[in-house]
Amino acid sequence: MENDKTVQGANQSANMYSYQEDQDQKYQFAQTGAIRRSLGEGNPSAFPENQINNISSMNNERAVGQNSIIIHIDQTPPLYWMFFVIFGIFQVIFIILLGCYYSKDNLINLELDDENGEDINKNGARDEITKNYKIFQEINVMIFLGFGFLRSFLKHHSWTSIAITLMGGIVAFEFGLFTLICWGAIFKRDWNNGIFNFQHFLDANYCAATIVISLGAVLGKLSLPQYLVMIFLETIFSTLNYVLLRQTMKIIDVGGALTVHLFGSIFGGMFSLVSSIMKNERERIRNSPHLGSNYNSNIFALFGTLLLITYFPSFNVSLIKDYSDKFKGVINTYLAILGSIVGSFCFSPFFNKGKIRIKDILNSCFSGGIIVAGSCHIINQLWASIILGVGSAEITTFLCNILSDKLKVYGYHDTSDIIYYHGIPGFLGGIVTTIFVGNLLQDKNETERNNFTDKNVYDYIGTIMNYTFEYNNNTFNSTDLSKYAGIHFSAIFITLAIAIASGFFAGFLIKFCNCNFAIRYFNDSEYFDVTNNESFPWDDELIDVQSNSRIGNGEKN
C-alpha cells in the first residue's frame, strides 16, 4: 500500500510537518513532540522510527480509512514561545511605568508607624490596612480561587483553566492600574491625585474580575498569544466603560452589575462568536471529545462556587465607604445569594427529568449576588433581596437550558455559559438598580424631602458612591430624580454598546490576523507537560485528512 506522502523537515526537532496526499492537499500541524500516526491497516513506515518519538498503528476496529491519521502532541508548539517573550516584555514595561509614576512622595500616606508606635499620618497605613486590606484579600480569594476552581470543570483542561484565570487576572490587574489612570485623565477626572492607596487596587481588582469572567467564554479554544491579545484589548475597553459610567455619569454600580458582570459576559460572548473561524472548526469545537466535565472536575468546580458564595458580599461592598450602607449591602447580598441557591435547587429538576443538573448549581447559586450587585446598599426591604435572588436563579436556569443548545446551531459556543450566568443577572441588576434609585429619598424625613435642592440630592448620592458631584443650585423636584434614573437606565445600553463593539473588534482582529488557534481543544497537553503523568487520559483525536476535519477520538475516556 503506497500513499505517496512527503515529509518536510523530517528530523525530530523540526517545527512543522507537512502531509501531502495524492489529491495534492497539504495539511500542516505545529509539532515539537511525539506523533502517533496510523494509515488504515498499514504500517507507519512513512516516518522513520528514529525520527518519531512514539508511533502506533490503529487496529481494524479503530480504522476509519486509509486517509486518516492520529496527531498526538506532547509538548508546546514553538509558536507559543512568542507568548512568553511578550509576557516578559510586558512585565518589564510595567516595572518601568510603576517606577516612573509612583515615587516615595506618592507613597507618603502609606508609611508605617514610627518607633513610638504612633501613626505618622492621620490617614496613614494603619487606617488603610484596617479599612481595606481584609476586603482586598477576600476579593483576591474570590477572583483567583473562586473563579479559578469554577473554571476547572472541563475534564481534561483543569490545569489550563486555572492557569489562564490566574494569568488573566494578573495581567488585567497590572495593566488596569494604568489604563484607569489614562482614561481618568482623558475624561479630566484626576482620581489618582498622585497618591497610591488601596482604592486603586480595588478598582484594578474590578478590572481583573471583568477579564476573568470573559475568559470563561473562550477557555480551551485559543492559543496563548491569542489569550494575551484578548486580555490586553479587553482591559482597555473595560476600564473605559468603568471610568465612563462610574466617574463621568456617576451611576450607582458598587458591585459591578454593569461594569463587571454585564460587560465581561457580553465582551466574552461576542469575542467567542466573531473569532470562531470556519464552519468545520466550529464543528471541531462542538464535537471535541475533551469538551465536558466528569465527576472529579465538577467537585473542584463546586468548591469554586462555594468560595464565590462565601466572598461575594465582600466584592459587592468593597467600594462603599459608609459603614451603615456597607452593612446593608452585606445583608442584602447574602440574602439574595441564599434565595438564588434555593431557586437553583428547586428549578433545575424541571429541565432534567426530575434530576438536579450540577451545571445549574455551579453557576446559578451566586446569580443572586449579581442581580443586587449595583443596588445592594439601597435596598431597604430584606424580603426583596430574597425574591430577587430566587428570580435570578430561575431566569438564568430557564434561559440556559432552553437557549444554550439552540444558539450552538448558529455557531455560537460559550465554554462556561457566561452569557446566561453573568450577562442575564447583570442586565437585570441594572434594571433593578434603576428602580431602586427612585427610592433613594425614603430614608429622609418629610421636612428634608420638601426642602431638598440639587445639592442635597447629589450629596446624598455622593455619600453612597464616595464621589463629589458638580451641581446647579436649583430647587429639587421629582423630575430631577427621574432624570437620574434615566441616566442609570441608559448606562445599561451604553455598557452593551461598548461591550459588543469592542468584543467584535477584538474577535475580528484575532480572526483577521489568522493566528493559530489551539491545536487540541480543551486539553491540558496543549500547554502543559503531561508526559510523565500516568493518570492523564490520553485520547488522541482522529483526523480525516481528505476532509481536513476531526471525526472522532482514539480512546473514549
Residue ranges: model-predicted function:
Residues D24, F29, G33-I35, N60:
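Intrinsically disordered, low-complexity, serine/threonine- and charge-rich segments
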Residues I35-L39, F47-N557:
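Hydrophobic alpha-helical transmembrane bundles of multi-pass membrane proteins
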